[in-house]
Amino acid sequence: VRSKRAIHAPYPTICVGNFQAGGTGKTPAALWVAQQLSVLGYSPIILIRGYKGTVSKSTIVDSKDAYAYGDETVLHAQYFPTIVGKNRQESARLAQNLPGDKKVLVMDDGLQHYELLKDFSIVCQKRLRFELDHMLPIGRLRQIPHTNIDAILSQMNEAGYEHVESWKGIPEYTFERETILISGSKKQGLVICGVANPDDCL
């Protein structure tokens, strides 16, 4: 049940989200969007819930405390002004306290947050395409896919993406994942991965 009336943010709002549960690359995609906006002369501000963080109300991130804000939040804050909080309306209002010309809000994982209206919505996907998936718990869909989105971002170097037509005529953009190997000593190491779908890391 929706408890609040949806409102427009004081600035243009771009949402990066997904229909499926688990890691689909939302955070790096949101960071990329913010980087492109910055290159074009805009002042991006990240809005993020702060998964696993302990902060209860919307807060402008001012430290690298992953316990308080969540690790994804701290990653964003290294590059752009970031506001963490479950209440996206409150976070959007708080953005007025941040400096910058031509502000644009970038929501990391905001597709299921209906209280804040979006001007442009991007859906990330990988592996099993969302239109072929099923609702939880049988599949990984968080909600029934709808056409109230503006673009689909797909990881190209997953099997089958090269020859699949875009869903419902919505523009689809593909990208290739680049694996970067860091050279160093030949000592054994330990890899720790905290994403939902660790196959890419492994």
Predicted regions and their residues:
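Walker A (P-loop) phosphate-binding motif
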Residues: 2-62
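Short beta-strand/turn micro-motifs composed of small residues
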Residues: 17, 48, 125, 153-156, ...
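Residues at the starts of beta-strands that form the adenosine-phosphate
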Residues: 42-44, 120, 150, 171, ...
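Conserved beta-strand elements of the Class I
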Residues: 43-47, 105, 123, 188-192
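Phosphate/Mg2+-binding loops and adjacent switch elements
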Residues: 53-165
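GTPase G-domain guanine-specificity segment
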Residues: 161-167, 196, 200-201
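Canonical P-loop GTPase G-domain recognition
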Residues: 168-181
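Redox- and metal-dependent alpha/beta enzyme cores, enriched for Fe-S-associated oxidoreductases
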Residues: 178-202
